[in-house]
Structure formats: C-alpha cells, structure tokens
C-alpha cells in the first residue's frame, strides 16, 4: 500500500495545482467575456440537485422476475464439514488483513467501489475469495485442456443471474455445493473453472469487473454459433505454366474490342448495383440485429477468468467467459472494465484506467503501479530495478536486512477451506442438468443431451434458421454416439431435402458418407466408403435413375473408374426386384491407372463396352514423349450365324489407330485373341455392375433396419448398463456367497453347546469325553432325521394338494373357462416343479447324511478338547 499511497498523494497534489490554475484562468476569461454571456452561466442549486436525484431514481434496474431457486435457504448445511462453518486462526488473521487493506483502499480511493474480498459462504461465514479457490486436477483426460474444462463447466451448471446487477454477490458458495446443485452465478462459474484450470497447470485468475448486457445475461442470440462457422479455405495460387517451345498458337480473335468493352462496362454496372443492394440489405439486417441501448451499460458487474501466457505453452493472454465456455481476446469490447482479480495465492487491484474497456490494460501483475497486491510473497516477480536503484543495495548486510523485512511482512495464504472437488463418472457423463441443455444462438438453436439418454444415441442437435425469429428451418445437424451402426452425424437440408449420413469406421458395409433424398432404390444417391476396409478398393459410388458411377483405388488390376448407363425396363416391375429383373445396361465405361509393368501402347487407359451397338472401344495410355495415344475399336459379333456356321475373324471387325504400328498387332490372330479377351471382360464387367446394384439394395435394406432398431453399443467396462456383465457379476457374487456359507458351516463349533454344560476350565475325564461325543453325535443324527422328515412332509403335502387340484379339475372340467384352464395348467406346472425339487433334495439328503455323520465323528475324534478319546483308541 506504500506505493499506492505515494501515487495517490502525487496525483492529489497535481490535481490541486491544476485546479488552482483552472480557477485563475476561469476568472480571467470571465472578466474578458461580454456581460450577456456571463448572465447565461448558472450554478447547480439545491432544487436542481433534487431534480437530478429524482430523475436518477426513476431509472429502473432490471432484476430477474424469477427468484433463483439456488439460495442459502435451499442448501442443506447439516452435512458440511467444520471448515465450512468456522474459521481457523490463520483465516481470521487473513480477514483482519483484508479489512485493513480495504480501509486503506477506501480512504485513498474514495471514488472506487468497495472491494470484493470476503463474501459469506453457504454457512454465513465470511471467507476470503482466494481461499474459496480449490486447485484440482480432474481424473478425466478430457478435462486437461482449458477449452474442454470451460465447455464442461458451461454445460454442467445452470446460470443464475446476480440478485443485484450493479453489485457483486453477498455470498460466494464453495465449488462442491455448486457442483451438488448444478446452479450458480457468474462468480460461482468462474470460481469453479479457475479451480480446475489452476489444477491443470494454467496461470488462471478470477476477475471481478464489468461486462456487457449480453455477457452478463448469457444472451447468445446475437452471436453466431461456433458450429456454423466454416473454416477459411486456403486459396492456392495457380502456378503459371510456361508455354512450351512447340505449341499450337490459339486462333485469331475476331470479336469486336469495342463490343467487349461495352459488355464489360455493362457487367460492371450490374455488379455495382448488386453490391449496392447487398450492402443495403446487410445494413438493414445489422440495424435489426443491433442491440437496444442499455441504461446500465458499463455498470453491470460480471466475473470471468483471465489466463496469462507462459504456463502450459499459452502464447498470449486471453479471457474465458465461464457462462458460455468461449474464449475472447483481452481487447474484446464485451469486457468493459476490471476492478480486481485473484488466484489461490494473492489478490490484486487494478490501478489502470478502463475508459477504453480492457483494451489498454497491461496484465503485468508484478508492476505495483498498475496492479496493487494485498499480500507479500506472491509468485509474481516485481519489476526489474534500474541501475541507479540497484547501485544503492549492493551491500550484503542491506540485502539481508531487506530480506528479513520482507520475510516479516509476508503472509502466506491459508489453505482452501473447500473440500476436494470430485465429479463422479455418472455426473461427468451426464454433463447437462437433467441430461439436457438448450442454447439459443443467432439464427440457430443448439440442443445437447447426455449419452444414452435418448434411445437412438442422439447427443446433440443444431437447427439453423433462415430468419432471426427462428421460424423457417434451413438445415438440421444431429450428432450421435455409441451407435452400433457407427452413425456419427446426420445432416438434413430442409431446402433441398438432401440427407447426408456420416459414419465412423466399423460399419458392416464400410460406409463413410451416404448422401440421398430418398431411401427408395434407383434414386439419386452418393455413397462413400472406407477403401481400406473393402477388398475391392471402392471409394465412392454415385447412382441416379439411369447411371451408376464407381471410383476405385489400390486395385491390382489398376481399375480407377467404372460408369454404367441403363435404359428403362421393358416391363414395369417392382423396384426391389432388381435381382430378378436388373436394369438393362446400355454402356459401360472403365478407366485404369497407368501400369508401369506394361508399355504404354499396350496398357489400356479406357475401355468402353457399347452393349446395344455391339462395339468395344479401347484407348491406351500416352507415352511421355508423345502427344497422341493409340486407339482400337472392335465390332463384336456372335460366334455363329443364323445357320449355325462359325464366323471367322475379318480385318473389318477391328479398326485401330496406332502411334507406332507394330507387326504383330496387325495379325488377325492377335486381334481375335484380344476380342475374345474383351468379351470375357465385358461379361465380367456386366456381372460386377449387377453385383453393385444388389449391394446398393442390401445397403438400403440394412440402413432401414438400423434406423428402425437404432441399437446402442455398451462398453464391457460399463457395469451398470451392460446386462451380460451385470449378470456375470451377480452370478459371481452368488458363488462367493455360497462359498462363504460353506466356510462358515465348516467352522461351526458343534461341541460348544455341550461344553457349556460343564464348569469352565475343568479338565474332561474319559467318561465325560465319551458322553459329550455320544450326545453330540446323537443330536446331529436327530437333526438329520428331522430335516429328512421335514422334506418328506413338504413333499407329501405338495403331492396331496396336486392330487386334490387334479380331482377338482376332473369334476369341473366341463364348466371351466379358458382363463380357469390356464390358471390350472400354470398351477400344475409350478406344483410339479416344487415336487421335483423336493424329491431331489430328499434323495440328496439321504445320500449325504451318512457321509456328514461320519465326517463329524472323525472331527470329534481329532478335536483336542476331547483328548481322552484319543487315548482310548490309541
């Protein structure tokens, strides 16, 4: 505070000198001005002050009509620990230091608002704000970075407005209470987020300042949804191709240059008019979207988080609004000023002017002129001293004395009074309160759900609208999780009715993207695949009513493209009967990549099967040193004529253009073998096109079944949802329980009731040992007999009741209704089950009773307490 006091005294002295100069200048100017001007000057009277006070009192401060359900009266404090209800001596000392600091600040800066130092907690106990922060590193890897932490806090908590928008809250609850009730104001949000960020290693601070109306009310209706912002496309500069030496000159341009210039002028005028209309429309929309003037602009209290650069490789300072989880630059106009900030170690007051919002603030907390700290010993280093200042403290004794003085004045911040912040896996997975949250953006609405809350796996939906009133839907995006069909995103365009499904790797058909307007077959659609998951290397398949195009990659035959043209069916059969009545193929076009193992003049680049015209066209790859490629065309004829005579290959059946003709390619045998090979390839291509049609039908049928079932996958580690794992765990628990009962049974002391009849500590005689052994065996034998009789009695009782029921059924069989017969059959089934179980238990008891008797007898002989028996049988 010494630096602050010196600074304030210097400013007051400068203000007094300036006021004296200003008064003297005003008197001189007043004497020089005319009388008429001097008459117009007025001073503020008591009546004018009362009128001003009345006008100011008429300003309505908008306070939320709904009282927040999260108040100190709704919190159960009976189960809170002692640290919440009392203060330690060190905390009491800290509160005294804070009060002294606040008094000095109020005395030296009377125009500033009171400091937000020690609000009450949920137990009505004052706690210093720095001790309310509890640095915590969450056990979830997703919460290790600042963006995921901020988004979690924004989703997990529900925003509650401040009771008074012009003042900080009177209560600041612990993060454990805020997590328990999932509600809080901006200070609760910031405290929670700052605790998580500090625990994750960030240099984070809670800020007490002023924000805009939208920021304080979490109003995002004038902000664009981040999910709708498209990434900027990088424009690649086209490299200028240098003209080759021997190139064909372009034809001479015979168009009129005057007409071209006039057309260019006309197009420029049209574009200028369109730009003007577009600019006017944008201005109109901006005027409609512009926020209304806020009477309390610059006065609304808000809290957010400041993250300084340095730790965790943060390149520059930035703000985080805990309400939305969005990050902002420190130059953002939404943040209008800062009063103070704090972390878990110290508290700082902003001594800089915020007339230009936070744009000119320098966040060097080690500068005591700009940031006044409350406690010494902060981790923020002070400003470096100049050489003149440094020359005066070269003596070692002075340095030691200075260190002792600082050590005496320093005060360590007490540990946080808040319990360890814990988020259960169930709460972390649920995220939003009650599993759902809705956020309204500008022309968009974002809905979020917890995983497994919706039966179809829907976790998020973004609805984009055309107008600001959000009435006309443009498109819908839906995100899914844990789908068995690996569906990740569904994009629906309401304008074109186009639907696009995106899949993660693992679909049975290796689907990646499916674009369609209708699930009916032979309609316009585009299907993309994960080519690494397919044997045939298919990347994409485009289908229309008359065409089908396929793109391949990584095939051993170097096929890259196949395009099939169809004609309408002769008979109008059902579309789903493509297997029995496929679409007639008119043309098949196939393209191939370059095969380096073959010479270019023998490597086919494109082949076209014209089925209706019975022709096959080939185009070969072009050599690097050539500008034209070889071509061939075969006239495909039947092997026999109408009379059954075999047709011989003739030269007119092959038309070829060869860049470098070779002798063997002119022979009819070569051409005949090539045509026979192409016939086989044509048959194979037709079969592959037919298989592609069947695969499309299979994919559509599978997608309809998946959409109807929308089965969700459950991890084997999710023991609460995984039924198989749950049944296995319950079975293991039953086995362990039965094993425990068997162990208890083996550890029963059969002699204890009989030894209790004798005086304690008395040594057994031989006669007493024999008598105890006989009594124990006879008692055990009687219990075995009683158990057998009990089972036999239950067996006979069940048998008699069943016989009576059967006799009753024989007597009343004619008058019985179907319901009575069903009840009778059900009873008989249950009775027979009980009789069968009792019979099995009785038979097992008869088998095990002698063995149990002999085992007990042997155990008694070996019991050290009946040592006399061992002497008898020794």
From Swiss-Prot:
Keyword Coiled coil carried by entry: yes
Biased composition (Acidic residues): 386-400
Record's keyword terms, sorted: Cell projection, Cilium, Coiled coil, Cytoplasm, Cytoskeleton, Differentiation, Flagellum, Spermatogenesis
Example of a GO cellular component annotation carried by this entry: motile cilium
Lineage: Eukaryota, Metazoa, Chordata, Craniata, Vertebrata
Similarity annotation: Belongs to the DRC7 family.
InterPro entries: CEPT76/DRC7_peptidase-like_dom, DRC7/lobo, DRC7_C, MORN_DRC7, Papain-like_cys_pep_sf
Biased composition (Basic and acidic residues): 401-410
Subunit structure: Component of the nexin-dynein regulatory complex (N-DRC). Interacts with TCTE1/DRC5. Interacts with DRC3 and GAS8/DRC4.
The protein, known as: Dynein regulatory complex subunit 7
Keyword Cytoplasm: yes
Organism for this UniProt entry: Macaca fascicularis
Subcellular locations according to the entry: Cell projection, Cilium, Flagellum; Cytoplasm, Cytoskeleton, Cilium axoneme; Cytoplasm, Cytoskeleton, Flagellum axoneme
Function: Component of the nexin-dynein regulatory complex (N-DRC) a key regulator of ciliary/flagellar motility which maintains the alignment and integrity of the distal axoneme and regulates microtubule sliding in motile axonemes. Involved in the regulation of flagellar motility. Essential for male fertility, sperm head morphogenesis and sperm flagellum formation.
């Amino acid at each position: 505070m010494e630096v602050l006091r010196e600074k304030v005294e210097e400013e007051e002295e400068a203000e007094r000198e300036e006021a004296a100069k200003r008064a003297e200048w005003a008197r001189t100017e007043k004497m020089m001005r005319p009388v008429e001007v001097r008459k117009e000057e007025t001073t503020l009277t008591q009546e004018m002050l009362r009128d001003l006070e009345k006008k100011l009192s008429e300003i309505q401060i908008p306070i939320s009509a709904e009282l927040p359900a999260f108040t100190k009266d709704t919190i159960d404090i009976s189960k809170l620990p002692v640290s919440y209800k009392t203060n330690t001596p060190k905390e009491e000392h800290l509160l005294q230091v804070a009060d002294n600091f606040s008094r000095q600040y109020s005395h030296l800066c009377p125009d500033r608002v009171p400091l937000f130092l020690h609000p009450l907690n949920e137990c009505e106990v004052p706690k210093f704000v720095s001790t309310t922060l509890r640095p915590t590193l969450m056990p979830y890897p997703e919460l290790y970075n600042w963006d995921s932490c901020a988004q979690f806090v924004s989703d997990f908590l529900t925003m509650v407005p401040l009771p008074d928008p012009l003042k900080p809250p009177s209560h600041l609850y612990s993060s454990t209470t805020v997590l328990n009730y999932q509600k809080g104001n901006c200070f609760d949000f910031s405290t929670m987020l700052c605790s998580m960020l500090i625990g994750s290693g960030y240099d984070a601070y809670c800020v007490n300042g002023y924000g805009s109306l939208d920021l304080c009310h979490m109003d995002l209706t004038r902000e664009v949804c981040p999910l709708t912002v498209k990434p900027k496309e990088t424009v690649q500069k086209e490299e200028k191709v240098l003209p080759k030496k021997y190139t064909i000159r372009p034809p001479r341009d015979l168009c009129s240059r005057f007409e071209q210039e006039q057309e260019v002028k006309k197009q420029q005028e049209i574009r200028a008019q369109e730009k003007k209309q577009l600019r006017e429309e944008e201005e109109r929309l901006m005027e409609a979207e512009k926020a209304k003037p806020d009477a309390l602009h610059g006065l609304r209290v808000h809290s957010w988080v400041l993250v300084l650069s340095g730790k965790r490789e943060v390149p520059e300072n930035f703000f985080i609004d805990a309400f939305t989880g969005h990050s902002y630059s420190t130059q953002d106009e939404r943040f209008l000023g800062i009063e103070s900030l704090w972390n878990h170690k110290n508290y700082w007051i902003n001594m800089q002017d915020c007339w230009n919002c936070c744009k000119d603030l320098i966040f060097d907390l080690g500068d005591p002129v700009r940031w006044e700290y409350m406690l010494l010993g902060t981790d923020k280093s002070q400003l470096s001293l100049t050489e003149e200042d440094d020359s005066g403290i070269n003596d070692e004794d002075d340095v030691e004395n200075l260190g002792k003085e600082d050590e005496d004045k320093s005060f360590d911040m007490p540990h946080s009074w808040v319990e360890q912040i814990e988020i259960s896996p169930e709460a972390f997975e649920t995220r939003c309160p009650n599993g759902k949250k809705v956020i309204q953006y500008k022309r968009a609405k974002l809905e979020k759900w917890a995983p497994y809350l919706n039966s179809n796996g829907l976790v998020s939906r973004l609805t984009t609208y055309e107008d600001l009133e959000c009435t006309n839907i443009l498109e819908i995006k839906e995100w899914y999780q844990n789908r068995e069909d690996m569906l990740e995103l569904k994009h629906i365009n309401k304008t074109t009715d186009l639907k696009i499904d995106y899949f993660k790797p693992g679909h049975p058909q290796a689907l990646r993207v499916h674009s369609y307007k209708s699930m009916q077959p032979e309609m316009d659609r585009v299907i993309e695949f994960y080519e690494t998951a397919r044997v045939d290397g298919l990347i994409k398949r485009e289908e229309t009513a008359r065409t089908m195009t396929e793109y391949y990659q990584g095939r051993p035959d170097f096929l890259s493209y196949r395009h099939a043209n169809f004609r309408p069916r002769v008979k109008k059969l059902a579309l789903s009967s493509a297997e029995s009545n496929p679409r007639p193929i008119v043309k098949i076009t196939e393209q191939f990549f370059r095969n380096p193992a073959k010479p270019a003049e023998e490597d086919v680049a494109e082949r076209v099967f014209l089925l209706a015209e019975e022709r096959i066209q080939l185009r070969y790859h072009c050599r690097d040193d050539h500008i034209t490629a070889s071509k061939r065309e075969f006239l495909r004829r039947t092997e026999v004529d109408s009379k059954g005579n075999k047709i011989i290959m003739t030269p007119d059946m092959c038309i070829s253009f060869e860049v470098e003709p070779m002798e063997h390619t002119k022979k009819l045998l070569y051409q005949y073998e090539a045509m026979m090979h192409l016939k086989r390839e044509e048959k194979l291509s037709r079969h592959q096109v037919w298989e592609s049609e069947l695969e499309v039908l299979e994919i559509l049928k599978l997608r309809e079944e998946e959409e109807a079932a929308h089965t969700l996958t459950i991890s084997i580690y999710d023991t609460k949802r995984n039924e198989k794992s749950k049944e296995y765990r319950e079975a293991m628990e039953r086995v362990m329980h039965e094993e425990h009962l068997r162990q208890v049974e083996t550890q029963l002391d059969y002699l204890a009731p009989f030894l209790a009849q004798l005086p304690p500590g008395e040594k057994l005689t031989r006669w007493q040992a024999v008598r105890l052994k006989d009594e124990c065996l006879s008692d055990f034998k009687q219990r075995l007999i009683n158990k057998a009789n009990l089972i036999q009695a239950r067996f006979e009782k069940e048998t008699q009741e069943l016989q009576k029921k059967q006799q009753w059924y024989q007597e009343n069989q004619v008058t019985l209704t179907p319901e009575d017969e069903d009840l009778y059959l059900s009873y008989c089934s249950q009775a027979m089950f009980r009789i069968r179980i009792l019979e099995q238990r009785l038979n097992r008891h008869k088998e095990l009773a002698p063995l149990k008797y002999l085992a007990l007898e042997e155990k008694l002989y070996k019991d050290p307490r009946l040592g006399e028996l061992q002497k008898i049988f020794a």
